[in-house]
Amino acid sequence: MRKACAWLLALALCGAGSATAALRLKLDAPGLDPAQREASQRLLDEAADKLPPAFRERLDREIAVEWRDDLPANGMGQARGPERIALNRRYLADLTDGSAASRQTGRVHGTERRELLATLLHELTHVYDRARLWSPEEKREIRRCTRQEETLGRIAQPGDCRGQAGRRFTLSDDPRLLDLAGWPQRAGQRGRREAHNGFVLRSPDVYELSNPREFVAVNMEYFLLDPSYACRRPALYRYYQQRFGWAPQHSACAQSFAYLNAGRDFGQQPLGQLDPERVYEVDYLLAEANDNLVSRWGHTMLRLVICAPGRPRGPDCRLDLDQHLVLSYRAFVGDLQLSSWDGLTGAYPSRLFVLPLSQVIEEYTKVELRSLASIPLKLDREEVASLVERAAQSHWSYDGQYYFISNNCAVETLKLLRSGIPRRPLQSLDSITPYGVLEMLENRKLADPSVLDDPKEALRLGYRFDSFRDRYQAMFDVLKRRLHIPQDKVEDWLALPARERQPWFARADLRASAALLLLEQASLRRQLLLAQDELKRLYLGHLDNPAGDQRLEVAGKTFQQILDDSGFLSRPAELLEGGYGLPQAAEWKHLEEQTRERQARLRRLSDDLDREVRALLDPERRAELEANEANIKEIGAHLRELHKAAGGLMLP
C-alpha cells in the first residue's frame, strides 16, 4: 500500500512539474536601483507575454537577462549562451525614465522601447532556434534522413530527405523556411542552398539577409509585434502560425495584390490588382527554342489564366485572353545588347516581369517566329492562391542575378514553384533547361501534357500558339504558285531588299496581293527589330562618350531617359520609400500617382524618340525601312483596287 501511495505521489508531482514547465525570464540585476529594476522587469514580462504559448512551453529553462556596458555601440542586445541574454546598458536610463517609449528610432518598430522589446524577442528566438526543439515527427525524419545520407551518400539520398539530414536548428535550417526566406536550392546540387539571398528589396531590416538564423529572428520580431506582418509577408506569417499553433491578432488584409504591368504600351496605366480568386489555373508556358544565343534552350514562363470580372471560375476563363498575365523571369539588361560573357558571369539582374499574354504571344509567334505551348499545372485552389501570392512577393522584393546556364528562366521558375507550392515532389526536381523542367513536371504528374495531343483543339482552346513562320510560308507558297517567284523559302523572300520585292506587286491578283501584304508587314516587323538592335549597338558603343557621335546628341538623351524611367516596371520597389513586403492599401495611392506620372513621361519620351530615332540609323537601314513602308502602302492600294474591281464592298 505504501509503495502504491508513493508511486501515485511521484506521478502527481511529475504531472505538476510538467504543467508548470515553461520559459522563465529572470532579471539579473546587481547594482540596479528599484526604479531600474521595475522598468526592466516590466520589459521582461511584456516579452514573455508576447511569445507564443508553445514557444514558452518548449523552451523549458530559466534565462537570465542582464544589462551590460561592453556590447557594441550599435547593438541593443545579444544572446550569450543558452541561458543568458545581455542588453545594452546605454538604453537603461531611457527605459527607466520612460523617454524610451516616445523616442523614435527611424525603424519600423518605431520607439526605442519597442526596439528593446524586439531585441529581447529576437535573442530569445536565437536561443529557441539553437535548442533543436523539433516535434517527434521531425526528429524521426531527421534521424532517418541522416542515417540514409551516412549510408548512401548525398547523391543516392531520396528526394524527401533533401535538407533534412544533419539539421542543427529548430527553424533556420528547415527546408520550407529556407524556400520562403530566399535561400532556395541550387540547381543540380542535390539540395544545397544558395549562399546569397536575392530578396533584397522592401526588407524591414537588411540584417535579416545576413543568414537564415538572423532571418528567423528578425521575422519573429515582426510576426509578434507588427499587426500588418500577416498582410506584408503572408506566407511567412502562416509558417510561424503553423509552427507554434498560434498567431497574434493582425490587420485585415486586402484580397488582391498590387503589381506593375511591364507591357510596352506606354499609354496604359501599368499599376494593376491581381486577385487570386480570379485565377482559374496556372500554366507552364514554354517558348520553343531557336538559334539565338539566349533562346537556344527555349524560354520558361508561367501563365495566369484569369477570369474576366464577373465570370465564375471554370474552363470558359481560358477564352478571356485579354485578362491573362504572364510571369517571366528575364535578364534585365537596360535594353542594351546582350553579352554572352556577362550572361555567364551573372552581370545581369534577374527580375520577375508581369506581362500581358497578348504581348508575349506577339513577341514570340510574330517577331521571333517561335511557337508557344501552354501546359496546365495540376494545382488545387490553395496551391494556386499560394503560388500567385509568392509571385507577387517576388515581383516586389526579388532582384537576383541572371546566369544563362545555372540561374536562367527555367531555374528561376522552378524556385518560384518550390517556394509557392509546398509539395514534396517539387523539392527533388533538378533541371536547368525549360524542356527539362517540363519533362520532370510531367513525370511527377504535376503537369498535364495531354492538352496538346490534338493540335487543332489545342490551338482552338489556347493551349498552343503556333509560330507565324508556317503562316508566312503558306502565304509565300501562294506567291510561288501564282507568280512563279524563284525563291523557295519565305526567309529567302524576306531577306531580299524591299525594292527587289516591289516589281512583283503589279502582277499579283487578289489572293496573291493579300499574301504580299501580310509578308510585307512581317518584313517591316523584322526591319524594326534590326533597327532596334542597331540602336542598341550604337548606344552601347558610345555609352561613356555620347558626344562621340553627333547623332546621339538629341535622340541619345531621349533613349537614355527611356531606359532610366522604364526600370521601375521590372523593379517596382523603387517607387516606394517606406514599408516592407507586399504594398498595402495606404501605399497604393502613392503607387498610382507615381506610376501615372512615370508612364505619362515615358509616353512623351517614346513619341519624341519615334520622331528622332530615324536620324540615328545608318542610311541603308533607314532607306530599307522607308522602302518597306512604301511597299505596304503600294500593295494596300493595289489590293483595294482589285477588291473594288471584283465588286467588293468599299467602306467610305
Indicate residue ranges for each PLM-predicted region:
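Activation targets extended, charge/polar-rich intrinsically disordered C-terminal tails
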Residues: 99-105, 130, 135-208, 218, ...
